[in-house]
Amino acid sequence: MSTSKKVYCNTILNRISFFGFLLCSIVTCKANNTQGVYYLDLDICNERYPNSEQYLVPVSFRDGTLCVYPDYHTETQIRTPMGLDDTFLLVDRLGLRLPTPEVVDSIYSQADIRLAPIPMPPTSEMTTRAYYVQHDSLIDAQLAQSGYPNDPEILQSSQAKLITGHKKDVVYIDRNSSRVAIYGWHRLTGELIQPYSTVHHDEYFDYSHGIRPVSPEVFKDGEWVIWSD
């Protein structure tokens, strides 16, 4: 089924894995009072948002399909935090947007790999590159223990798995805000380390912050629809 074909259906997203490869997303539809199963093109997200730097993966959200980064934004293969101005420049360039707490929770509940958070001591060094490079190496060690290959090329391929738990998310806030909004860092129990907070100024970031761009639209009932906060 192509993205241009109109079908009216209630989407139930199932991510099917075969030898480690994502095969398809299934949409159960009711058209002309007939139940049927339609197969979405695997590249539906990546065809819609071709500027993405990572292979977008589907997440079920509000009875539709949302497209999300499988991991946090990286620069030179390092998960890299940044101030709010640069964050908005990034998502605008990609044609994407920041998630909301609701999206963060949906991603966590559907993740392929959930990592235990690794808080580091809250020192004056926590905003330095050396600190978040160190944190990144700890995350990579966790992924290696899980059996997930430490290969940056995977994030650009259909073999990418949805990973969560390893960072607080920078979440959507008004562009004119003087604060940055953060949320998440779920423990394996599902408990949050970081409730929604705007305590920091807009250009603050530290090693614990992650930027995960998501699509501004959901694919629902055969159409792309803008979702609101």
Region locations from a protein language model:
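Intrinsically disordered, low-complexity, charge-dense segments enriched in Lys/Arg
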Residues: V133-P216, E223-W227
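Short, compositionally biased
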Residues: I12, F21, C29-D85, D112-I113, ...
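Conserved hydrophobic ligand-interaction patch in extracellular adhesion modules
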Residues: L84-I154, P213
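Bacterial N-terminal signal peptides
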Residues: S17-S25
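N-terminal secretory signal peptides that target proteins for export/translocation
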Residues: M1-L13
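Alpha-helix/helix-capping structural signal
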Residues: I26-V27, E102
